[in-house]
């Protein structure tokens, strides 16, 4: 079993039950899924760029990405409805905990001038969104093989009802928030 999953089952649930006075252990918020999205605007002119992004996203997450397509045509971007413009991966279960562990322990500390992640990036329903400016922070990405530095969005979806519960859940997992 994954290190974070064991920590959740042994320590985090008890701590959250005490802190928020839950009547049952089943009320404790859990991480439901993690969605990693990479928008590739350059894919409109050159579809090879999208293949590189898909390859990198697969290396980072260990799962084959879904190619996202444009919902609307936008003339100023020379974009037609249905054109491939990005890739996303939805992680659940074991892979989700592996990715979160790698993100917290390895990748975030590799960010340049890292002070911690924002405490305010919650959406009001207990979900946390994190923007990463470059894919090079992940150990699976080889610096020499990267043709363009791309960012990505990481959304951590929890079953928490409030942002405060979700913030506490993530900080119990070791998420480095701003002081």
Swiss-Prot record:
Cysteine disulfide partners in this protein: none
Gene Ontology CC terms: ribonucleoprotein complex; ribosome
Molecular function, one GO term: structural constituent of ribosome
Keywords recorded for this protein, A-Z: Ribonucleoprotein, Ribosomal protein, RNA-binding, rRNA-binding, tRNA-binding
Alphabetical list of PROSITE patterns matching this protein: RIBOSOMAL_L5
GO BP: any one term: translation
Matches recorded under SUPFAM superfamilies: RL5-like (SSF55282)
Pfam families: Ribosomal_L5 (PF00281), Ribosomal_L5_C (PF00673)
Keyword presence, Lyase: no
Subunit composition and interactions: Part of the 50S ribosomal subunit; part of the 5S rRNA/L5/L18/L25 subcomplex. Contacts the 5S rRNA and the P site tRNA. Forms a bridge to the 30S subunit in the 70S ribosome.
Role: This is one of the proteins that bind and probably mediate the attachment of the 5S RNA into the large ribosomal subunit, where it forms part of the central protuberance. In the 70S ribosome it contacts protein S13 of the 30S subunit (bridge B1b), connecting the 2 subunits; this bridge is implicated in subunit movement. Contacts the P site tRNA; the 5S rRNA and some of its associated proteins might help stabilize positioning of ribosome-bound tRNAs.
HAMAP family: Ribosomal_uL5_B
Family: Belongs to the universal ribosomal protein uL5 family.
Protein name in UniProt: Large ribosomal subunit protein uL5
Gene: rplE
């Amino acid at each position: 079993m994954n290190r974070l999953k064991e920590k959740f089952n042994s320590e985090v649930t008890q701590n959250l039950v005490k802190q928020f006075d839950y009547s049952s252990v089943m009320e404790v918020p859990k991480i439901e899924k993690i969605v990693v999205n990479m928008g590739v605007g350059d894919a409109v002119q050159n579809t090879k760029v999208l293949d590189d992004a898909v390859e990198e996203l697969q290396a980072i997450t260990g799962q084959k990405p879904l190619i996202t397509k444009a919902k609307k045509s936008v003339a100023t971007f020379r974009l037609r409805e249905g054109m491939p413009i990005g890739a996303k991966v939805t992680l659940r279960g074991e892979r989700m905990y592996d990715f979160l562990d790698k993100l917290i322990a390895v990748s975030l500390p590799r960010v340049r001038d890292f002070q911690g992640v924002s405490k305010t990036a919650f959406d009001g329903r207990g979900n946390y969104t994190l923007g990463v400016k470059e894919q090079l922070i992940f150990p699976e990405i080889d610096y020499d093989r990267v043709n363009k530095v791309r960012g990505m969005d990481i959304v951590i979806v929890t079953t928490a009802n409030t942002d405060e519960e979700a913030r506490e859940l993530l900080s119990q997992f070791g998420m480095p928030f701003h002081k």
